[in-house]
Swiss-Prot record:
Full protein name: Serine/threonine-protein kinase Nek11
Organism, scientific name: Homo sapiens (Human)
GO biological process: intracellular signal transduction; mitotic intra-S DNA damage checkpoint signaling; protein phosphorylation; regulation of mitotic cell cycle phase transition
Domain named Protein kinase: residues: 29-287
Pfam family membership, one: Pkinase
Enzyme class label: transferase
Family of this protein: Belongs to the protein kinase superfamily. NEK Ser/Thr protein kinase family. NIMA subfamily.
Impact upon substituting residue 617 to N: In a colorectal adenocarcinoma sample; somatic mutation
Length: 645
C-alpha cells in the first residue's frame, strides 16, 4: 500500500506546484504539461519514473487545502488507501495521494480521449449525434462501474459528463471519490462541486445522499448523450434547482427505443426508493439482450487478441531457445542479483574503468597502425627515388668506361647486351637499400611521445572519463568517492537498474516485453468478465447506502469548511474577472436582497439586464450565493436568504 506523504514544512499561503517543465514531484513524477484547471484545483500530465514501459503517463490533480492537522492527514490516508484498491475497467484507476507543500495531490490513470463532455460538445458543434449502439454500449459500461462501486458500499457523489473519461473509446468514471475524500461526511459534497445539472432532488433538499442519487446523475448523463443537452436547464441557478425538485421528468426523442426512455424515466423518479439500482437496470430484458450481444463481441475481440499474443509469444520463445546462454553468464547474473546496491555501484565503476582501458587501447592501436602505414609509404617513395638516381648514375659511368676501353676499330655492343648489363647492375644495387641511404632532406616523420599522449587525452576527454590512478590504494579511494552522499533513496533506484541490466543482456533485441502494452485489450477482457458475471447473477438484493447511516469510514469530516471556502473563493474570483469588481459587487448585493425578499424570476431578470448585457452572465454569482447559504446551514447557523425549496 502506498504511503501517505506529509509535507515537512507547511507555509501559511497557498503555494501551487511549480509549472516548470520536467519538474520532479514527490521524487517520482516528472511534470510534462498542464491539462486544465477546475474549481478544486489544477490537473497536470506527469510521467511516472517507476512505472512499467508504456504506462508512464499519469494524471496529477493538485488541490489547494491550506494547512492540515495531523488527524486530518491520517483520515485522508485511510480513505485514499480504500480508493486505491478499486480495480474495474469502467473506473479510472486511483494510484496514490500525498501532500506536496500545502497541496493535496492525487495520482490517477491517464485517459487520452479527454472527457465525455468534450466529446459531446465536439459532436454538437459538428451537428452530429452518437449512434444508438454506441450510446447503449457506453451506458452499460457506466452501469457496470456504478454497480461495482455500490457493491462495495461506496458512493461517487459527483457523477457528470465532465467526470467521465474516454480511453480507447471505452468510458471510465473519473474523479471517483475525490469529492467524498475532500469533503468528509459533509452532506453537501455534491452541491459544492459545480453546476446543479446532475444533482438529485434529495441532495438539493438535504435529505441524505445514497446510491439512488448516483442513479439520478447517471440518468442525466444518458439524456445528455442522447440529446446533446442537459436534462434540466435554466436561465439561472435557482431555476435549474426548481426544475429538478418540482419540474416534469424529461423524455428522450422518438428516434430512441421506448424501452430506453422508460429506463431513463424510472431512474429520474423523484422518489429515491422507487428508482432501480444499477444491477436491476442491467437485468431489464432490453438491456439484458444488449449485454449478451456485447459479451459475444468482447469475447471475439479477446479471442483474436489472445491468438495474436500466442503467436508473438511463440516467436519470442523460439528466439529465446535459439540464443545460447553460457552457464558462466547465468552464474555471473546470479551473483549480481545477490549484491547490495553499493556493491553494484562499485562493480559498475570497475566496468567503466575496464571500458575506458579498452577504448584507450583501441585508440593507441589505431594511431600505431596509422603511423606504420605512413612510415611505409614514405620509405617506399624514397626508395624508388634513390634507386632511380643510383641506377642512372652507374649506367652513365659504365658507358663512359666502355667507351674508353673499346678499341677504335671495334664496333660497340648491341642495345640488347647493354640492357642486360643495366638490369644486372640494378639487381645488384637493389639488394642493399637501407635507411642510411635515404637523403637527409627527406627525414621520416615520426610521432613524438608527448604528441601521442595529447591526442589520446583529447580523444578520451569527450567520453567524460577522469584519470584513474594506478596506485591500488588511491584507486580504491577513486572507486569509493561517490558513496559519501549515498542514501536509502538511491538504494532502491540502483537496485532497480542493476536488476534491469542483466535482463537486457539476456533478452534478444527484438523480443516482446513480458507485460501487455495495449491497455484496451485488458480492459475489454475485463469488461467481458464483468458482463459474464452480470448475466450469471440472479440475486437482485442490493442494499441502499446512505451517508447518514452508513458512511465510508468513521471519523471527523475532512477539510469541510476549508474546501468549501476554497471553492467559493475561486468562484468569487472567477465572477469578478468576468464582470469586473464594481459590477460584481452590485450584482452580488442585488441578488442577495432579491432572494431575501423572494422576488420573482422575471423581476430579477429585468433588473439584472440593466447592469449586464445578459442575465445569464450572473449565473455564477447566483450560484455563489446559494453555496454560501448551504454552508451556513451545514455549519448549524441560521440562513440569511429565503428558503425556496
Amino acid at each position: 500500500m502506498l504511503k501517505f506523504q506529509e509535507a515537512a514544512k507547511c507555509v501559511s499561503g497557498s503555494t501551487a506546484i511549480s509549472t516548470y517543465p520536467k519538474t520532479l514531484i514527490a521524487r517520482r513524477y516528472v511534470l510534462q504539461q498542464k491539462l486544465g484547471s477546475g474549481s478544486f484545483g489544477t490537473v497536470y500530465l506527469v510521467s511516472d519514473k517507476k512505472a512499467k514501459r508504456g504506462e508512464e503517463l499519469k494524471v496529477l490533480k493538485e488541490i489547494s487545502v491550506g494547512e492540515l492537522n495531523p488527524n486530518e492527514t491520517v483520515q485522508a490516508n485511510l480513505e485514499a488507501q480504500l480508493l486505491s484498491k478499486l480495480d474495474h475497467p469502467a473506473i479510472v484507476k486511483f494510484h496514490a495521494s500525498f501532500v506536496e507543500q500545502d497541496n493535496f495531490c492525487i495520482i490517477t490513470e491517464y485517459c487520452e480521449g479527454r472527457d465525455l463532455d468534450d466529446k459531446i460538445q465536439e459532436y454538437k458543434q459538428a451537428g452530429k449525434i452518437f449512434p444508438e449502439n454506441q450510446i447503449i454500449e457506453w451506458f452499460i459500461q457506466l452501469l457496470l462501474g456504478v454497480d461495482y462501486m455500490h457493491e462495495r458500499r461506496i458512493l461517487h457523489r459527483d457523477l457528470k459528463s465532465k467526470n467521465v473519461f474516454l480511453k480507447n473509446n471505452l468510458l471510465k468514471i473519473g474523479d471517483f471519490g475525490v469529492s467524498r475524500l475532500l469533503m468528509g461526511s459533509c452532506d453537501l459534497a455534491t452541491t459544492l462541486t459545480g453546476t446543479p445539472h446532475y444533482m438529485s432532488p434529495e441532495a438539493l433538499k438535504h435529505q441524505g445522499y445514497d446510491t439512488k442519487s448516483d442513479i439520478w446523475s447517471l440518468a442525466c448523463i444518458l439524456y445528455e448523450m442522447c440529446c446533446m443537452n442537459h436534462a434540466f436547464a435554466g436561465s439561472n441557478f435557482l431555476s435549474i434547482v426548481l426544475k429538478i425538485v418540482e419540474g416534469d421528468t424529461p423524455s428522450l426523442p422518438e428516434r430512441y427505443p421506448k424501452e430506453l426512455n422508460a429506463i431513463m424515466e424510472s431512474m429520474l423518479n423523484k422518489n429515491p426508493s422507487l428508482r432501480p439500482s444499477a444491477i436491476e437496470i442491467l437485468k431489464i430484458p432490453y438491456l439484458d439482450e444488449q449485454l449478451q450481444n456485447l459479451m459475444c463481441r468482447y469475447s471475439e475481440m479477446t479471442l483474436e487478441d489472445k491468438n495474436l499474443d500466442c503467436q508473438k509469444e511463440a516467436a519470442h520463445i523460439i528466439n529465446a531457445m535459439q540464443k545460447r546462454i553460457h552457464l558462466q553468464t547465468l552464474r555471473a547474473l546470479s551473483e549480481v542479483q545477490k549484491m547490495t546496491p553499493r556493491e553494484r555501484m562499485r562493480l559498475r565503476k570497475l566496468q567503466a574503468a575496464d571500458e575506458k582501458a579498452r577504448k584507450l587501447k583501441k585508440i593507441v592501436e589505431e594511431k600505431y597502425e596509422e603511423n606504420s602505414k605512413r612510415m611505409q609509404e614514405l620509405r617506399s617513395r624514397n626508395f624508388q627515388q634513390l634507386s632511380v638516381d643510383v641506377l642512372h648514375e652507374k649506367t652513365h659511368l659504365k658507358g663512359m668506361e666502355e667507351k674508353e676501353e673499346q678499341p677504335e676499330g671495334r664496333l660497340s655492343c648491341s642495345p640488347q647486351d647493354e640492357d642486360e648489363e643495366r638490369w644486372q647492375g640494378r639487381e645488384e644495387e637493389s639488394d642493399e637499400p637501407t635507411l642510411e641511404n635515404l637523403p637527409e632532406s627527406q627525414p621520416i616523420p615520426s610521432m613524438d611521445l608527448h604528441e601521442l599522449e595529447s591526442i589520446v587525452e583529447d580523444a578520451t576527454s569527450d567520453l567524460g572519463y577522469h584519470e584513474i590512478p594506478e596506485d591500488p590504494l588511491v584507486a580504491e579511494e577513486y572507486y569509493a568517492d561517490a558513496f559519501d552522499s549515498y542514501c536509502e533513496e538511491s538504494d532502491e533506484e540502483e537496485e532497480e537498474i542493476a536488476l534491469e541490466r542483466p535482463e537486457k543482456e539476456i533478452r534478444n533485441e527484438g523480443s516482446q516485453p513480458a507485460y501487455r502494452t495495449n491497455q484496451q485489450d485488458s480492459d475489454i477482457e475485463a469488461l467481458a468478465r464483468c458482463l459474464e458475471n452480470v448475466l450469471g447473477c440472479t440475486s437482485l438484493d442490493t442494499k441502499t447506502i446512505t451517508t447518514m447511516a452508513e458512511d465510508m469510514s468513521p471519523g471527523p469530516p475532512i477539510f469541510n469548511s476549508v474546501m468549501a471556502r476554497t471553492k467559493m473563493k475561486r468562484m468569487r474570483e472567477s465572477a469578478m474577472q468576468k464582470l469586473g469588481t464594481e459590477v460584481f459587487e452590485e450584482v452580488y448585493n442585488y441578488l442577495k436582497r432579491a432572494r431575501h425578499q423572494n422576488a420573482s424570476e422575471a423581476e430579477i431578470r429585468e433588473c439584472l439586464e440593466k447592469v449586464v448585457p445578459q442575465a445569464s452572465d450572473c449565473f455564477e454569482v447566483d450560484q455563489l450565493l446559494y453555496f454560501e447559504e448551504q454552508l451556513l446551514i451545514t455549519m448549524g447557523k441560521e440562513p440569511t436568504l429565503q428558503n425556496h425549496l
